[in-house]
């Protein structure tokens, strides 16, 4: 009976150790994914800002071609 208790204890202990190792690796992977997401958001913000500037500049040029100016004349 004591042998079974020790064996069961050993199996449970090893299971918990392997589970904690897997959780730790999972957290590290999630942290790496978060860093990648932040980089993607940063690049998207830069592209979005450049697009807004490009559209604003294009609208000004179109307004000049049509004959409208900022003074409303």
UniProtKB/Swiss-Prot annotation:
Keyword match Transmembrane helix: no
Location of this chain's protein in the cell: Secreted
GO cellular component: extracellular region
Domain of life: Eukaryota
Keyword Signal: yes
Propeptide: 23-39
InterPro entries: Antimicrobial15 (IPR012518), Frog_antimicrobial_propeptide (IPR004275), FSAP (IPR016322)
GO biological process, one term: symbiont-mediated hemolysis of host erythrocyte
Assigned keywords, A-Z: Amphibian defense peptide, Antibiotic, Antimicrobial, Cleavage on pair of basic residues, Secreted, Signal
Primary residence: secreted
Signal peptide range: 1-22
A Pfam match: FSAP_sig_propep
Tissue: Expressed by the skin glands.
Function according to Swiss-Prot or TrEMBL: Has antibacterial activity against Gram-negative bacterium E.coli ATCC 25922 (MIC=120 uM) but not against S.pneumoniae ATCC 700603, S.choleraesuis ATCC 14028 or against Gram-positive bacterium S.aureus ATCC 29313. Shows no hemolytic activity and no cytotoxicity.
Family per similarity comment: Belongs to the frog skin active peptide (FSAP) family. Ocellatin subfamily.
Protein name: Ocellatin-PT6
Source organism of this protein record: Leptodactylus pustulatus
């Amino acid at each position: 009976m004591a042998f079974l208790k020790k064996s069961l204890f050993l199996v449970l202990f090893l299971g918990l150790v392997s589970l904690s190792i897997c959780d730790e690796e999972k957290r590290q992977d999630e942290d790496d994914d978060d860093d990648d997401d932040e980089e993607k958001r940063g690049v998207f913000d830069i592209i979005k800002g450049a697009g807004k500037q490009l559209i604003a500049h294009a609208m000004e040029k179109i307004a000049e071609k049509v004959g409208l100016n900022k003074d409303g004349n």
